[in-house]
Amino acid sequence: MQICLMDETGATDGALSVLAARWGLEHDEDNPMALVLTPQYLELRKRDEPKLGGIFVDFVGGAMAHRRKFGGGRGEAVAKAVGIKGDYLPDVVDATAGLGRDAFVLASVGCRVRMLERNPVVAALLDDGLTRGYADADIGGWLQERLQLIHASSLTALTDITPRPQVVYLDPMFPHRQKSALVKKEMRVFQSLVGPDLDADGLLEPARQLATKRVVVKRPDYAPPLADVATPNAIVTKGHRFDIYAGTPLTE
């Protein structure tokens, strides 16, 4: 994959070349998207809109730390949607990991989560965030046990994952409506890189075959059901809904 590769003064010498080789990235000086290695973290920038700032994954501080400490925890919609109740903490495959936020919420309340991400730039951002998170004295211990990254396309990987999870979580990128042009700055940068998941409909059936309990699909409130498969089971929040589908139970 081609992207502009940059490092800032103070970044570890040679680290950018190692990173590019690991994730199969090629430097393209004219690419409007840039992957920048700073002394603190790896971040994604939209070069033609510098005011949007950079995107990076931070499980330790910022919004993620605030959500972990002061958010709803088990009361969050995503936790309810995957079925967390009492001592039941399902094993989850997040098949569209993105920036890892929902996966982190689930891990922080006790679920084991395997994140799948096919875009090598996004996978590199997630890996950078995980590396720093694993090294953190406060969260590193449980984060290493509960949150892992698999760099692969869900369209193929969902048929190969073992052991089977109880829940598969899907949050495919969906085009924003025109009147929502003032989408969060962060999402504008992110969508410029990955675009909408035009093949997302193909995820529902393999997800249902893989999950032993349920599949949860996060959708904007205006979006049709994934693959146009309606379900009466959903948790509705302001602006979103979590559609819930039955999985395929284990056979003895």
UniProtKB/Swiss-Prot annotation:
Keywords: Cytoplasm, Methyltransferase, rRNA processing, S-adenosyl-L-methionine, Transferase. PANTHER family: RIBOSOMAL RNA SMALL SUBUNIT METHYLTRANSFERASE J (PTHR36112:SF1). One of its GO terms (cellular component) is cytoplasm. Specifically methylates the guanosine in position 1516 of 16S rRNA. Belongs to the methyltransferase superfamily. RsmJ family. Its EC number is 2.1.1.242. It is found in: Cytoplasm. HAMAP family: 16SrRNA_methyltr_J. This is Ribosomal RNA small subunit methyltransferase J. It is an enzyme of class 2 (transferase). It catalyses: guanosine(1516) in 16S rRNA + S-adenosyl-L-methionine = N(2)-methylguanosine(1516) in 16S rRNA + S-adenosyl-L-homocysteine + H(+). SUPFAM superfamilies: S-adenosyl-L-methionine-dependent methyltransferases. Signal peptide: none annotated. Its main location: cytoplasm. GO terms for molecular function: rRNA (guanine-N2-)-methyltransferase activity. S-adenosyl-L-methionine binds at residues 101-102, 117-118, 153-154, 171. Pfam families: SAM_MT (PF04445).
